[in-house]
Amino acid sequence: MRFSQLFVNTLKESPKDAVLKSHQYLIRGGFIQQIGSGIYNFLPLGKKLLDKVRFIVKEEMDKSGAQEILMGFVTPAELWRESGRYEQYGRELLRFVDRKENEFVLGPTHEEVITHIAKNTIKSYKQLPLHLYQIHSKFRDELRPRFGLMRGREFIMKDGYSFHSNYADLNREFDVMEATYKRILQRMGLEFKVVEADSGAIGGSGSKEFMVLAPCGEDTIVVCKGCEYGANIEASKRAPRTAPRPNEIKYDSNAPQAAFARFFTPDIKNIESLSAFFKVDKFWTIKAIVKKAIKANNESELVYFFVRGDDEGEETKMLNAINKHTNCYLALEDASVEEIQAAGLEVGFIGAYGLRHITQATHIYFDESLRDASNLICGANEKDYHFVGVDLSTFEGLEYADIAQSKEGDLCPKCAQELYYTKGIEVGHIFKLGDKYSRAMNAQFLDNDGKTQPLIMGCYGFGISRILPAILEQKSDDLGCIWSKEVSVFDIAIIISNTKDSVQNDFGSALYEILSACGIDVLLDERDERFGVKMKDFELLGFHSALIVGKGLNEGKVELIKREGLKKYELCATDKEILLEEILKIIA
């Protein structure tokens, strides 16, 4: 390709709403063009990037034994009702009605469609296992689309679905997909972490996310200093807590030794002041968290959570706790002071004693770190009073769950070394769906005993368009994009410094033909522009490398620059065969 024929328009300035460098560079480099909120066109350079990513993903998926299909972008709403997700998914699911009053959705994910395919195709265990995948556009009606391709409303995704006769085979395929995704990310030259994750609206269990490490990542990852453990903060675990965190101790770290008693605590409404009042570490206090749980029909109720005073509640964990038995709640919101008072409680003095009797609440949960704990201080459900000497082992029927957020300094559940936070961009997610969808949609097969069984399913998503900003957030520099060779739009750009110099022109054009004949994807920059402009474009667009044909040619020299690190190589240009060997060796 000759640069003069390339449909691209680079910009010096970034759009005002482009916060992340990936968004800025993709717009400035002419890779993408915004046409609506969270909706982008992919111009030739952007489309070629997508094709490179698609090729890697398809090659690795096919190698794993999966088969590619293509499902409709539009899905009948009845399939989503059949699975039970039509109401559960919320307003991110774009719904519409056609001229015949038939209801449809734009698919953000395709579990329902693939289950429908399997239901009408798979009849016997002899047809299993089966793994089908597609690479297709999706639509999620994000409330606040932002950060360019990182969180758009329309996006391109590889979503795969596997079907099995038993859980052992699902586990095998899950491991195969984990290894496949690792190979994909390694081929793209990325530093990443595989972490435990929450299954969210997809459902199922055994969920893992693939995080590209980057400071701007939306996800907080909890990572161990001593082993390979890692988890999204929403699903992170920690070793049992038996003492305050050493780095947070402010008052006496020992358990307060006091008989059970009711104390007058005037205007002591938060954990900080409670800890100061009794001169004890916050670890020995109980923090009450009151939330309003929202159902699909917009009905709501107050739910109650208790954690150690030096902990915070983790919202996803808390939502999972109340959904453990009914799975009818969509979200949690902070309860207002008025709502708490209407329940008969005083803000700042809420405690475990008599709570169910006062509020008639269905959902009251205690964090696992409080299981059978003693020597505690909690609210007395009475204004200006707290209880000391609280012993939860004397309570009957308490429901415990992992609802606290793991904090830096907590200990790893696997090796007991310290945990710390880092940031990541989720680019892949794999799930063990089990029979969640097959039971709901009656997708069955006959086992080897002739008995009807629900299909066992797995689900595997990879963000084709999202990986582009992820690469840039990790790899790019202050000058522009940096793409690895496998992803770069062109393997090498030949930049003719002075197009008015016939020697430079002839040499550059001849080398362009030689490299192209060798199967190298080459861009010949023969534009009548200043050399500085051409170099700025090379740095912005991030092609893997560039060969500079300039004044050095008079002395039999050309210069090769690798975009990552801008490392320079001076090459002898007198023998084109030797020069070709050197170029191929460096850009390999």
Swiss-Prot record:
Record Gene3D superfamilies: Anticodon-binding domain (3.40.50.800), Bira Bifunctional Protein, Domain 2 (3.30.930.10)
Subcellular location: Cytoplasm
GO cellular component terms attached to this protein's record: cytosol
GO biological process: prolyl-tRNA aminoacylation
CDD domains registered for this protein in UniProt: ProRS-INS (cd04334), ProRS_anticodon_short (cd00861), ProRS_core_prok (cd00779)
Entry keywords, A to Z: Aminoacyl-tRNA synthetase, ATP-binding, Cytoplasm, Ligase, Nucleotide-binding, Protein biosynthesis
Catalytic activity, as annotated: tRNA(Pro) + L-proline + ATP = L-prolyl-tRNA(Pro) + AMP + diphosphate
EC number(s) stated in the UniProt entry for this protein: 6.1.1.15
Main location per the UniProt record: cytoplasm
GO terms of molecular function: aminoacyl-tRNA deacylase activity; ATP binding; proline-tRNA ligase activity
PROSITE patterns per record: AA_TRNA_LIGASE_II
Family: Belongs to the class-II aminoacyl-tRNA synthetase family. ProS type 1 subfamily.
Assembly mode: Homodimer.
Domain notes: Consists of three domains: the N-terminal catalytic domain, the editing domain and the C-terminal anticodon-binding domain.
Free-text function comment from the UniProt entry: Catalyzes the attachment of proline to tRNA(Pro) in a two-step reaction: proline is first activated by ATP to form Pro-AMP and then transferred to the acceptor end of tRNA(Pro). As ProRS can inadvertently accommodate and process non-cognate amino acids such as alanine and cysteine, to avoid such errors it has two additional distinct editing activities against alanine. One activity is designated as 'pretransfer' editing and involves the tRNA(Pro)-independent hydrolysis of activated Ala-AMP.
Protein name, entry field: Proline--tRNA ligase
Gene: proS
